[in-house]
């Protein structure tokens, strides 16, 4: 009986030793890839599509809510993108840097979001497709008390709903 168990265990060990190793996974490509097998695909009409096609944010000068020429170009691309996807709605988030009171920055963030919305509406996008919200200084993109951080935080971000 002991010999049979030993023979059976030996056979199992031989079978296990003969099994082939698992195949190697394919090499990882750069994020966003070229659309080949295994790369991340951007879904048309998605937030990622908006970011890649038009850009999702514009920036403002200190304590300002007027639209710069660069911001106007981004909003023009966003309007073109929104025309391609007539069923998509968006929310424009207004943001500020950390300077100023909470109340002041909430109001300034709302003016920034509304200014961006006004440009999109003037470009032919129905106002009913665009909502606005202000986060003031509550959601910084960059944490820090430098001019570079402040500049990145004074923004309006268009978010696909």
For the regions a protein language model found, what residue spans apply to each?
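Bacterial N-terminal signal peptides that target proteins for export
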Residues: 1-8
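C-terminal motif of bacterial Sec signal peptides marking the signal peptidase cleavage site
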Residues: 14-17
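Periplasmic peptidoglycan-binding/tethering modules of Gram-negative envelope proteins
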Residues: 19-89
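Extracytoplasmic/secreted proteins, especially bacterial periplasmic and envelope-associated proteins
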Residues: 70, 74-77, 103, 111, ...
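A non-catalytic structural micro-motif
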Residues: 87-95, 110-141, 154-161
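Short beta-alpha junctions and helix-cap segments that line functional grooves
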Residues: 143-146
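A generic structural micro-feature
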Residues: 148-152
């Amino acid at each position: 009986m002991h010999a049979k168990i030993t023979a059976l265990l030996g056979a199992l060990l031989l079978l296990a030793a003969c099994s082939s190793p698992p195949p190697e996974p394919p090499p990882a490509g750069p994020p966003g890839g070229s659309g080949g097998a295994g790369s991340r695909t951007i879904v048309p009409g998605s937030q990622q599509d908006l970011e890649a096609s038009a850009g999702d944010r514009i920036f403002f000068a200190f304590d300002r809510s007027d639209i710069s020429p660069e911001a106007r170009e981004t909003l023009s691309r966003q309007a073109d993108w929104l025309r391609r996807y007539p069923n998509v709605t968006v929310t424009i988030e207004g943001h500020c840097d950390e300077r100023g009171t909470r109340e002041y920055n909430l109001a300034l963030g709302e003016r920034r979001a509304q200014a961006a919305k006004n440009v999109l509406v003037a470009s032919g996008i129905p106002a009913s497709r665009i909502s606005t919200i202000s986060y003031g200084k509550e959601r910084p993109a960059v944490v820090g008390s430098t001019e570079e951080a402040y500049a990145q935080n004074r923004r309006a971000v268009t978010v696909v709903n």
